[in-house]
Amino acid sequence: MQTHVRRVALQALRPCLRAGLMAPKFPVRFATTAVSGELLTKTPYTRPGYAAQWTCLVVLFLKNQLLMRLFFAFVAYVVAMKVFGARFHVDHDEDATPAE
């Protein structure tokens, strides 16, 4: 029962412990991590550097811009076909007399 009370109290006070506003009076196992050690993966993970992060952001932005522009071009084409039909030019009769 005492372990459960400690765990509940620790869960409630975890933000204060992380911020350094309180010092625990008893040894705590889960003070700094919200996930138990058994659930953590053993593979080492290193965060990407700033260059990799910015490269990823730029690539995603350009990809999304390209898709958006292609989509709008397709929509404009469909609307133009519906409004104007398949003809985009006016036929000229070469044999007609010039208008005066």
From Swiss-Prot:
Q: How does it assemble?
A: Plants bc1 complex contains 10 subunits; 3 respiratory subunits, 2 core proteins and 5 low-molecular weight proteins.
Is Membrane included in the keywords of this UniProt record?
yes
Which purpose does this protein serve, as stated in its record? This is a component of the ubiquinol-cytochrome c reductase complex (complex III or cytochrome b-c1 complex), which is part of the mitochondrial respiratory chain.
Q: What is this protein called?
A: Ubiquinol-cytochrome-C reductase complex subunit IX, mitochondrial
The domain of life for this entry's organism is Eukaryota
GO CC, sorted alphabetically, is: mitochondrial inner membrane
- Which residue ranges traverse the bilayer? 66-86
State the organism's lineage. Eukaryota, Discoba, Euglenozoa, Euglenida, Spirocuta
